[in-house]
Amino acid sequence: MMQQLRRISLPRLQRHVTLSLLSRCGSTSTDVPPEELDAFERDYLQQRIQITTFQRLLLGAGSSIASLLNPHRHDMIACLGETTGENALLNILDTMQASEEGRRILVEKPRINTKTIDLKSLEALPSDSFGFAYAKFLKDNNVTPDSRMEVRFLEDPKLAYIMTRYRECHDLVHAVLDMPTNMLCEVTVKWVEALNNGLPMCYGAAVFGAVRLRPRQRREYLKRYLPWAIENSKQMKPLMPIYWEKRWEQKVNDLRAELGIKPFQ
């Protein structure tokens, strides 16, 4: 049974779900007239995979088990986030709509990838700028903004964009927190995200990721990293409404102070 779960393939799972629904659901559609949808929403509605409540529960359970067995299965983690995060995404939507910056993001729906961001220009910014810090983070950790999986299982395209935005901003959060991508820091960043945005998958990754830490890492985690994440969460502003792309030239320490982020010591 465990070996079978380890071999779960998300593309194969997606095909199974799609084929089982074609006879009952037909092609994907929406009650909103196409002319009232923006480009992201139209594209998403053409590519999403519609699933029933039962299939959502099944996918959530299967992806959670597969994620626990193999934390490197990013496809399963992504699936888990989509099948369990709707209520949290609705709360994030409310938070974003409550701020001018957040509303602008929801209207413009910016994307973060190498087609939309000139990393060379960020590297040319002053060394104390947020844009430079982000470009340096990508280079130092051998990370690309093109690695995020597309959202597929959410019904509402507005929530699909918020989940997309969350995924594409993950490395920006690493950069502003000054946290590399090793396991200890990944768990810490997940705690910060979980306490900040409430997504169940973030809590799951934080809790079960910590279980996989080595003894020495776990001691450091309990003594320094986890208390730092919790303390920051008490004073940190919501991160999802931040239009990071408009902050490239801002001094990174000023941005941290604005957001209520206390540097890790």
UniProtKB/Swiss-Prot annotation:
Protein name stated in the entry: Ubiquinone biosynthesis protein COQ4 homolog, mitochondrial
Function: Lyase that catalyzes the C1-decarboxylation of 4-hydroxy-3-methoxy-5-(all-trans-polyprenyl)benzoic acid into 2-methoxy-6-(all-trans-polyprenyl)phenol during ubiquinone biosynthesis.
Pathway: Cofactor biosynthesis; ubiquinone biosynthesis
EC number: 4.1.1.130
Species, as recorded: Drosophila mojavensis
A GO CC term attached to the entry: extrinsic component of mitochondrial inner membrane
InterPro entries the UniProt entry points to: Coq4, Coq4_euk
Entry binding sites for Zn(2+): H170, D171, H174, E186
Gene Ontology biological process terms in this record: ubiquinone biosynthetic process
Known catalytic reactions: a 4-hydroxy-3-methoxy-5-(all-trans-polyprenyl)benzoate + H(+) = a 2-methoxy-6-(all-trans-polyprenyl)phenol + CO2
Compartments (UniProt record): Mitochondrion inner membrane
Subunit (UniProt): Component of a multi-subunit COQ enzyme complex.
Highest taxon of the lineage: Eukaryota
